[in-house]
Amino acid sequence: MRNLAALLPALFLLGSSLLPAGTALAQPLHGISMHGTPELPADFRHFPYVNPDVKKGGRISYGVVGTFDSLNPFVLKGMRTTARGVWDPEFGNLLYESLMLRSSDEPFSLYGLLAETVEWDDERSFIQFNINPRAKWSDGKPVTPDDVIFTFSLLKEKGRPPFNSRLDGVAKMEKVGDRGVRFTFNDKANRETPLILASSTPILPKHAIDPEKFEQAGLGPVVGSGPYRIKTLRPGERIIWERNPDYWGKDIPGKVGFDNYDEISVTYFLQVTTMFEAFKKGDIDIYPEGDAINGTSDTSHWGQAYNFPAVHRGDIVKDVFQPRLPTGMFGLVFNTRRATFADEKVREGLSYALDFEWLNRNILGGSFKRTQSYWQNSPLGAYGNAADERELALLGDAAKTMPAELLAGTYAMPTTDGTGADRKVLKLAVDKLKEAGYSIKNGKMSDANGRQLAFEIMTQNPAQERIALAYQRSLNLIGVAMGIRSVDDGQYQARSNSFDYDMIIRSLPSSLSPGMEQLNRWNSLSRDAQGSFNYAGVANPDIDRMIEALLQARSTEDFQAAVRAYDRLLVAGHYIIPLYYIGAQWVARWKYIDRPDMTPISGNQKQTWWDARVQ
């Protein structure tokens, strides 16, 4: 026995040496973080921004503008016309769930959901998810590693971007024991890859999905692991979700204080105006103002439209939330796939022509601030932060072509006198267009062959049209012809997917932990991938390098330098004419819908609100 005891340490070391590199000392973890460690301990009971004592029950009615004809947002056909709630960062992932949950009060930390624990090494050469033994589908069957493997394989073959590229960085995907599934990474992976697999991919039921019909994106019966199931479905009009009384995950820490309604309905409207009228009548319970994605932010509406009896009686509450996020970018996007916008000088000149001060004063209510960079109002932003040696080294020769003001952190869009005809600023626009070979001939901005500089902007609602009309007014002053094409929601989504536009108005939100989503927005490989978010059609090797740098950064200092350098490159490219940011989230609600007091980093979390009528 003494000899056996003496041999045990050696046997352990021998066994460890036979394991894959980096796995010998891997320990099951309750959570992981992109940088550092998760803030919450292994025995945490709930997220800090929820009410753990809320009584579940009642109902809520949401309203959205648009339509739906699909329950599958993971293929191109259903990408923008899937019913809300299926896979939904705003209303919650009611049907499908991910392996891990992201905390809304940390830059990028994940905690267990379908995966009870997770294992990885310091090099992040692999990640292993250990499926929660309690996890089950709505039909009672258990969630298994086979479902995970099936999901990633199916999405690689038939999914849309970015789901179809999730396995690009994976060398091997394998089942480990009864509950484990391990992903071993190749040299295409980066340090964020394991977190994206964990938090940004839905796990689908192998037994309930026919791969041959997956791309049809229809409205057939669905099986999910989430807290709700479909009660009523009226395509294009309304979907009603009801609580699954047998939901497996209601007591795990990451779900405490969530999913508080017995019933969730989502009603679809053709226009924002009709949705607001429905809110006034109590047909929907919440009305979020300031939708930058659709260009409907309007301080005058927030300040003046709430003059009706329900407000006077105190039945409606107007909340203002202060998220601690970068401003992001909302603006007019040049499609550089078009020859008209291939020259950076053309884009710069056309950017100067927008009179933001006139637009803000006369159209937007006068309360907005001009966006100057993509990560403005954060330590990651180029605006207000000079490039240091670390950042300059990353930029390399690209820094030599940047304006000195951009490197100094003082670069900003020109400020006009607000008259709508500031000659000084318009001259800047004309001079820059001259550098690109244009000049004004017979009142028209024309190239050397006499062709007028002309393009079209595509809009999807009246608010965007107002912005476009203001821009058109300014361009007319310098002889540039801009047409406005207003299309319905279906056309807008289809043409956006195929990049069939000259210019559109879009929003690109930013976080404190930018990562792989940037590949789908700005990387060269996404330029021609239909359905990607590379609306500007950018293919720039320096931008590709900087995305790779931020993805591979190990220290906070390296990460910050990479994102700032990236921000400067995007600003220098003049791919988007920046508009404005609000700096707050405005949400009106009927007072019978209540919410937690705390606002996390990411802002309001509607998934944690509740029906006060049942308390």
Swiss-Prot record:
Signal sequence segment: 1-26
A GO MF term: peptide transmembrane transporter activity
Protein location: Periplasm
UniProt keywords, alphabetically: Peptide transport, Periplasm, Protein transport, Signal, Transport
Pfam families tied to this protein: SBP_bac_5
Tagged with keyword Signal: yes
Any one GO biological process: microcin transport
Phenotype upon loss of function: The deletion mutant is hypersensitive to ampicillin, in a manner only partly dependent on the beta-lactamase AmpC. Deletion of the gene leads to the accumulation of peptidoglycan fragments in the extracellular milieu. The mutant displays cell swelling and lysis as well as a severe growth defect.
One GO term describing the cellular component: ATP-binding cassette (ABC) transporter complex
Function according to Swiss-Prot or TrEMBL: Part of the ABC transporter complex YejBEF-YepA involved in the uptake of muropeptides, the breakdown products of cell wall peptidoglycan. The import of muropeptides into the cell enables peptidoglycan recycling, which is vital for cell wall integrity in this bacterium. Probably binds muropeptides.
Other observations noted: YepA is located separately from the rest of the transporter in the genome.
Family of the protein in this entry: Belongs to the bacterial solute-binding protein 5 family.
Subunit structure: The complex is composed of one ATP-binding protein (YejF), two transmembrane proteins (YejB and YejE) and a solute-binding protein (YepA).
Protein known as: Peptidoglycan-binding protein YepA
Organism: Agrobacterium fabrum (strain C58 / ATCC 33970) (Agrobacterium tumefaciens (strain C58))
Gene: yepA
